[in-house]
């Protein structure tokens, strides 16, 4: 009875175990996740790419920048769009921005290209005999120092005929010539040479070209985007929480200047101070003002310009007559505006550098090249070098509430004396200089000071002041002051994520149906969750393609406009690069989609299972709480692995599809009678006949071998054999007696078809008998295995129950034995303790008894 109960329990356990296992399998299958490809996701990565320019310049303007921008830049967008990216935090670094390097190279290339067709002034490297100039003016009170600012020089120069020379007179600024061997004994006459002749070649700027810059917009090619930081308190480096995306930057004027930044953008709220490292006094400090300061510069004289032939087909432009005082070039700055601005700058510097007990001092430049020690800039085609000591000569006093300044200026206008140079060594490059031809007439230019470039003196141990001086010289800092809030990123429209959808069947691809989604822009959904952003994928993907096409058309028109020049500028080359890069990126993405079997699809499920080692986050965490940017960072290390698995899966699917299509041609009954299949039928027929003949031979050989083993001689199976029974012997062997008297013969078959039919019949019977025997044997083996297995399982179950009971009894016996032993040991311990206690308690009694005995 006990065994039957155990068997019944075991059967119940088997049923419940099978049910639980099935439920586990179903649940696990229901939770399987598969890789799904998304095209058009708002994901980007930092990148460096070739930017192109846009400008609204007019083609009829003769100014070089304008001509260059008109022919080499695309027109600006009259309605530029800026798309805010909510819930996005991006890192910016103005000190490691490739846009700055590109702009620096572009402006240098612009200046170099403007000089290429111009006249080389190498013949001017001759000995100059110079003396002070005589000024033709009604005012006879002319300062001697001002007279020495310009020299009237004579020199011999080749005329239109190379074998003839003539003496030529022209005027040079004192800064452009250097004496040879000291002054002569004549006092006001000596030998000079041009300042560049021992270091660099000189090229005269083309006379119809001025250097007044116009705004230039830098634009990203298709497949890339420009991110803009709109955080007012952004200091140029670090995370920015107010980010937007634009296709082009704002209009940036390529103003080449030192110490002061002119006609740039202004800060919002308050003055902004930016530096790569505030504690390093070797790093430049870029100050962005919140309110512009007007600066008016002028050369008050009325100059004339003359052309001097220096050889066949070459002309040198020099200053002719001088009307008025040409040396009195100067700039005017409002003292009130400047003091107010500098006080705000000092307040911001104090926050970054010093404590509340330190004064801030502004001082003039400590020395260096004239481009560094003065405020150098271009005004109306002339290069001014102005002394800024009047601007940087004050102290921010500690504890003074009215921001008292000590300025060495009495009037309300600060006058900055300026000098003019015509030989300019641009970009601090050795070996190349430019001669700026003089500009006739009065020159006046009005600009806005929008920024300052400062350097900080090293702080000594015994000083409580911080001294700041004007700096500059590296034009990258000028461009950095405008490009600090931009960065270029590469759009990565392909994304993979786990979903429950699986590519289940092998079928021909169909183009995905577009979803009617509201237009948010390609990167507009960057801050949305993955689930919300996936709704706009169709619109984003179409916008990407349309943006590429539109941009290619604009670039193509700009390139076509340069064909009459028979050459391309640096911008033309970059536009070609931008066109190729945009098409290449789009084709690369489409190639990947085609390899994965996702051509024309925005959401493409695959049959690649999602590996939890890539990311073990749940579906709700992924699609409801994460953005595509966060998800891309989560799986960026496994992206290439996933791509390879998708490609392998698609390759296998194509193989399966090819096999399926190969079988599809037999689906129609009429295809069986197609003439193209006849050769295939003949081949199969020949194979069957050959197989039958081979089997016939094999069975014949086996039959002969079998008969030989039984003692018979091999006879032809096509010969009729007649056996005459002996009168006293029955048919066959003794055990076969009693059979009827008849002849025994082998069946004689004649003809091809009867022979084939007989062989086929024998083959079928043989196969049937052998297969039946094999099936019976297999069924018997399976039945035996099942019975033995069930008996073994029952035996093992009973054995487990038996040994469980035995172990239980053994454990109980062990516990009883331990309890008894512990009880005995405990009783002895208690008895010993009791005896010790009684002995201790009887000590007084024993003492009393001892005393009583002693007294007795």
UniProtKB/Swiss-Prot annotation:
Annotated region described as CD4-binding loop, given as residue ranges: 365-375
Sorted UniProt keywords: AIDS, Apoptosis, Clathrin-mediated endocytosis of virus by host, Cleavage on pair of basic residues, Coiled coil, Disulfide bond, Fusion of virus membrane with host endosomal membrane, Fusion of virus membrane with host membrane, Glycoprotein, Host cell membrane, Host endosome, Host membrane, Host-virus interaction, Lipoprotein, Membrane, Palmitate, Signal, Transmembrane, Transmembrane helix, Viral attachment to host cell, Viral envelope protein, Viral immunoevasion, Viral penetration into host cytoplasm, Virion, Virus endocytosis by host, Virus entry into host cell
Note: Inhibitors targeting HIV-1 viral envelope proteins are used as antiretroviral drugs. Attachment of virions to the cell surface via non-specific interactions and CD4 binding can be blocked by inhibitors that include cyanovirin-N, cyclotriazadisulfonamide analogs, PRO 2000, TNX 355 and PRO 542. In addition, BMS 806 can block CD4-induced conformational changes. Env interactions with the coreceptor molecules can be targeted by CCR5 antagonists including SCH-D, maraviroc (UK 427857) and aplaviroc (GW 873140), and the CXCR4 antagonist AMD 070. HIV-1 lineages are divided in three main groups, M (for Major), O (for Outlier), and N (for New, or Non-M, Non-O). The vast majority of strains found worldwide belong to the group M. Group O seems to be endemic to and largely confined to Cameroon and neighboring countries in West Central Africa, where these viruses represent a small minority of HIV-1 strains. The group N is represented by a limited number of isolates from Cameroonian persons. The group M is further subdivided in 9 clades or subtypes (A to D, F to H, J and K).
Annotated segments matching region V1: 130-152
Source taxon at top rank: Viruses
Motif (YXXL motif) on chain: 712-715
Alphabetical list of InterPro entries matching this protein: Gp120_core_sf, Gp160, GP41-like, HIV1_Gp120
Site (Cleavage): 511-512
Positions of the UniProt region annotated as V3: 297-330
Stated name of the protein: Envelope glycoprotein gp160
């Amino acid at each position: 009875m006990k065994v039957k109960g155990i068997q019944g329990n075991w059967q119940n356990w088997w049923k419940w175990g099978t049910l639980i296992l099935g439920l586990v399998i179903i649940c696990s299958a229901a939770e399987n996740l598969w890789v799904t490809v998304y095209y058009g996701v708002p994901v980007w990565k930092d990148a460096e790419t070739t930017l192109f320019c846009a400008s609204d310049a007019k083609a009829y303007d003769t100014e070089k920048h304008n001509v260059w921008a008109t022919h080499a830049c695309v027109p600006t967008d009259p309605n530029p769009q800026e798309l805010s990216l909510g819930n996005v935090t991006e890192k910016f670094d103005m000190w490691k921005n490739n846009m700055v390097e590109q702009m620096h190279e572009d402006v240098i290339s612009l200046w170099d290209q403007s000089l290429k067709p111009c006249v080389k002034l190498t013949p001017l490297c001759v000995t100059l005999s110079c003396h002070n100039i005589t000024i033709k003016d009604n005012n006879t009170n002319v300062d001697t120092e001002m007279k020495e600012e310009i020299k009237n020089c004579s020199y011999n120069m080749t005329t239109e005929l190379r074998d003839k020379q003539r003496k030529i007179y022209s005027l040079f600024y004192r800064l452009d010539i250097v004496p040879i061997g000291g002054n002569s004994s004549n006092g006001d006459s000596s030998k000079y040479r041009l300042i560049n002749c021992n270091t660099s070649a000189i090229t005269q700027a083309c006379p119809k070209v001025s250097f007044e810059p116009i705004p230039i917009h830098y634009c990203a090619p298709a497949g890339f985007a420009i991110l803009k930081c709109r955080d007012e308190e952004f200091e140029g480096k670090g995370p920015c929480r107010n980010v937007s995306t634009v296709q082009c930057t704002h209009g940036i004027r390529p103003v080449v200047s030192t110490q002061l930044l002119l006609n740039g953008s202004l800060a919002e709220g308050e003055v902004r101070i930016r530096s790569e490292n505030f504690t390093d006094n070797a790093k430049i400090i870029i100050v962005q003002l919140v309110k512009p300061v007007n600066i008016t510069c002028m050369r008050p004289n009325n100059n004339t310009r003359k052309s001097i032939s220096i050889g066949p087909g070459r002309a040198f432009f020099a200053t002719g007559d001088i009307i008025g005082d040409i040396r009195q070039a100067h700039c005017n700055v409002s003292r009130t505006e400047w003091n107010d601005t500098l006080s705000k700058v000092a307040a911001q510097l104090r926050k970054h550098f010093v404590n509340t007990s330190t004064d801030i001092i502004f001082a003039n430049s400590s020395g260096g090249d004239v481009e560094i020690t003065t405020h150098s800039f271009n005004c109306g085609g002339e290069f001014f070098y102005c002394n800024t000591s009047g601007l940087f000569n004050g102290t921010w006093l500690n504890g003074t509430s009215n921001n008292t300044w000590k300025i060495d200026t009495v009037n309300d206008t600060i006058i900055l004396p300026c000098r003019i140079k015509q030989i300019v060594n641009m970009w601090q490059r050795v070996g190349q200089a430019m001669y700026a031809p003089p500009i006739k007439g009065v020159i006046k230019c009005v600009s806005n000071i929008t920024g300052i470039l400062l350097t900080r003196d090293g702080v000594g141990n015994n000083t409580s002041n911080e001294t700041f001086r004007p700096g500059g010289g590296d034009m990258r800092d000028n461009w950095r002051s405008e490009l600090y809030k931009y960065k270029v990123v590469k759009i990565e429209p392909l994304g993979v994520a786990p979903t429950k959808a699986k590519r289940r069947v092998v079928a021909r691809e169909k183009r995905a149906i577009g979803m009617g989604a509201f237009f948010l822009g390609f990167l507009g959904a960057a801050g949305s969750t993955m689930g919300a952003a996936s709704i706009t994928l169709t619109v984003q993907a179409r916008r990407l393609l349309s943006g590429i096409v539109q941009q290619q058309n604009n670039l193509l028109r700009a390139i076509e406009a340069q064909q009459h020049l028979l050459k391309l500028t640096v911008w033309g080359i970059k536009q070609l690069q931008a066109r190729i890069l945009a098409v290449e990126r789009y084709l690369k993405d489409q190639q990947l989609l085609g390899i994965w079997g996702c051509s024309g699809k925005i959401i493409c499920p695959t049959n690649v299972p999602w590996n939890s080692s890539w990311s073990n986050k749940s579906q709700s965490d992924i699609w409801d709480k994460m953005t595509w940017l966060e998800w891309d960072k989560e799986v960026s290390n496994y992206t290439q692995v996933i791509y390879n698995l998708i490609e392998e899966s698609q390759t296998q699917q194509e193989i399966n599809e090819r096999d399926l299509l190969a079988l599809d041609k037999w689906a129609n009954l009429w295809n069986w009678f197609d003439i193209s299949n006849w050769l295939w039928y003949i081949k199969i027929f020949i194979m069957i006949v050959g197989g039958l003949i081979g089997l016939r031979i094999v069975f014949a050989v086996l039959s002969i071998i079998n008969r030989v083993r039984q003692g018979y001689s091999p006879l032809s199976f096509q010969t009729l054999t007649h056996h005459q029974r002996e009168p006293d012997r029955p048919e066959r062997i003794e055990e076969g007696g009693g059979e009827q008297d008849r002849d025994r013969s082998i069946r004689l078959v004649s003809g091809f078809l009867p022979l084939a039919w007989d062989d086929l019949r024998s083959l079928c019977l043989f196969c049937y008998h052998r297969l039946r025997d094999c099936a019976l044997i297999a069924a018997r083996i399976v039945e035996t295995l099942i019975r033995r297995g069930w008996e073994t399982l029952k035996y093992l179950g009973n054995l487990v129950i038996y040994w469980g009971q035995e172990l239980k009894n053994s454990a109980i016996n062990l516990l009883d034995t331990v309890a008894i032993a512990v009880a005995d040991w405990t009783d002895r311990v208690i008895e010993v303790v009791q005896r010790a206690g009684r002995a201790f308690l009887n000590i007084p009694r024993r003492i009393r008894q001892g005393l009583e005995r002693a007294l007795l």
